[in-house]
Amino acid sequence: MKILFVSRAYPPVIGGIENQNYALSIWLQRYAIVKTLANRYGKKMIPLFFPYVTIRVLFMMRSFDVLFLGDGVLAIVGFIVKLCYPHKTVVSVVHGLDLTYRNNFYQTFWVRCFLPSLDGIIAVSQETKNTAVIKKIPEEKVTVIANGVETEALQGHYERKDLEKLLGVSLEDRYVLLTTGRLAKRKGAVWFIRNVLQKLPNNTLYVLAGAGPEEENIYAAIKETGLAARVIMLGRVSDHDRDLLLNTADIFVQPNIRVPGDMEGFGIAVIEATACQRPVVASNLEGLKDAICHNENGILVTPEDSQAFVTALTRLLHDNHERLALGERAKAYTETHYHWKVIARRYVVALEAAAKSVK
């Protein structure tokens, strides 16, 4: 099978979709012939990239079996291709925000017109599929395939002293909770600081690595609660420092909350943590329910239930054996279920099935 893969978000730009699309472009080549057309220059180039890539795809599509789109925003390209090549297969990955983005123009054309016109949709979680079906995308077109992770690339030989150097504090007799990724409201950091952190043992430190629109609110929550000595905001970090954090923190927390018009499509950050043998405590919400199998690669907690979070975290902090055992199970589970060598093969099977349905 010959796949023409299009990505509007791609390295060297840093981000979750960028990383996933890069991995797809590499790992799919193990099972198929793949040509990638990618925007490598960030959002500023998207207005030029869309007409450019549409024209290129229209000229190239005769030589390929499947047009594979890296996210739902590219559905307009797929729609145009289907008009010109009705017997060619077009499939798109869909993340949560591809369906829930609160813009009437986008909802009218992309969600109600362009996406349903495609031959297949690969949703990154069951919650994303449920949302797609609610949005009237035919259920038979939607396949659920989780995001993948290359476990070996994240794992490293880091020591606690490396973490102390990065954070600039002594960690003797201290526990480190970690959250990484874009600081959006749905991630729940503000809620966690206000409702959970101050109820945890005083020797518990909360580290956030990432940037985003919620930063000011997080700083305000730190000030209001008087927890400045227990919260460290690192901002955006390098891949090296992210890996260091993931390999040395005690517990990874993802305390997501419900936010109208937004959702966690999958939750790749928790899978990156489990790949590094970190126990995870996360909200039993949206795509996190797909990423985490309770008591296998983490613990799922009722969203916005502060006492449930306190109980789960305190138990793990005070029981070294249980914490380490959960981390070991998490790593094994992740390598079995989420390694890219497994996920990429599932993508190829889904693309082959979509191609057969068109013929």
Residue ranges and their predicted role:
Residues 4, 170-187, 193-197:
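Conserved donor-binding/catalytic core segment of Leloir-type glycosyltransferases
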